């Protein structure tokens, strides 16, 4: 009888360990292949080591001083100017 209970507990614990291991491995691969590219998610997790998807300069003050350094930066909705209508 105790043999059956022990075997049942062993199978239960082994199943939990395998499921947890698969979840951790899945999260690791998804993080490194996709999620680490988003600066917002890196800030939430506190990961400063992986800078793969970050194309910004290390210090924000340098980027603010030279606006011509990033010509591809989109303006926010507040900064956009409506198109000029010439009346044609």
From Swiss-Prot:
Main location as per UniProt: membrane
Coiled-coil ranges from the UniProt annotation: none
Membrane topology reported for the UniProt record: Single-pass membrane protein
Bias type Polar residues, positions: 48-60
Start-end of Basic residues biased regions: 72-81
Region described as Disordered: spans on this chain: 48-88
Domain of life of the organism encoding this protein: Eukaryota
CC terms in the record's Gene Ontology section: membrane
UniProt keywords, alphabetically: Membrane, Phosphoprotein, Transmembrane, Transmembrane helix
Family as reported in the entry's similarity comment: Belongs to the SMIM13 family.
Entry protein name: Small integral membrane protein 13
Classification lineage: Eukaryota, Metazoa, Chordata, Craniata, Vertebrata
């Amino acid at each position: 009888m105790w043999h059956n209970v022990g075997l049942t507990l062993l199978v239960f614990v082994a199943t939990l360990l395998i499921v947890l291991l698969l979840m951790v491995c899945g999260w690791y691969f998804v993080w490194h292949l996709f999620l680490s590219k988003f600066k917002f998610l890196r800030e939430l997790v506190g990961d400063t080591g992986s800078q793969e998807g970050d194309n910004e300069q290390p210090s924000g003050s340098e980027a603010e001083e030279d606006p011509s350094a990033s010509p591809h930066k989109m303006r926010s909705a507040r900064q956009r100017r409506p198109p000029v209508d010439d009346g044609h």
